[in-house]
């Protein structure tokens, strides 16, 4: 038979796995990675980022707003803008080389009517 302390450790680990989701926390943000913990938009310190809280939760996460998300193909998946988390790297749309190599300046509408955008990663293929 197992020693008692080994059995207790196994029971504790199995219980933590079952009730804790196996150590994997579900994502809060839909259009970016989860940013820092927050309660209000002010705590996120970025106009392109807001505090998203699931209903009934006292805390949320700083998330990139959908208009500033970086789409990844047509599968409704998104990449993080440069600098996020915690902050988004903004860029003047009129200057296409403002973002570092491997990134492009994307406005919230995806067109030239917006002056500022965010630096999104280029995806080839």
From Swiss-Prot:
Extent of the signal sequence: 1-16
A single cellular component GO annotation: extracellular region
Keywords: Glycoprotein, Secreted, Signal
Entry keyword annotation includes Secreted: yes
Tissues with expression: Expressed at highest levels in mantle, followed by adductor muscle. Found in the nacreous shell layer (at protein level).
Keyword Glycoprotein assigned: yes
Domain of life: Eukaryota
Entry comment on modification after translation: Weakly glycosylated.
Localization of this protein: Secreted
Protein name: Upsalin
Species per Swiss-Prot/TrEMBL record: Unio pictorum
């Amino acid at each position: 038979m197992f020693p008692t302390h080994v059995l207790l450790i196994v029971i504790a680990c199995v219980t933590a796995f079952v009730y804790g989701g196996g150590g994997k926390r579900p994502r809060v943000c839909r259009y970016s990675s989860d940013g820092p913990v927050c309660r209000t938009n002010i705590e996120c310190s970025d106009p392109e980022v807001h505090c998203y809280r699931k209903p009934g939760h006292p805390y949320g996460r700083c998330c990139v707003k959908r208009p500033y998300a970086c789409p990844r193909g047509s599968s409704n998946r998104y990449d993080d803008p440069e600098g996020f988390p915690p902050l988004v790297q903004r860029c003047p749309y009129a200057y296409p080389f403002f973002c570092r190599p491997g990134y492009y300046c994307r406005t919230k509408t995806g067109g030239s009517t917006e002056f500022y955008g965010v630096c999104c990663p280029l995806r080839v293929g």
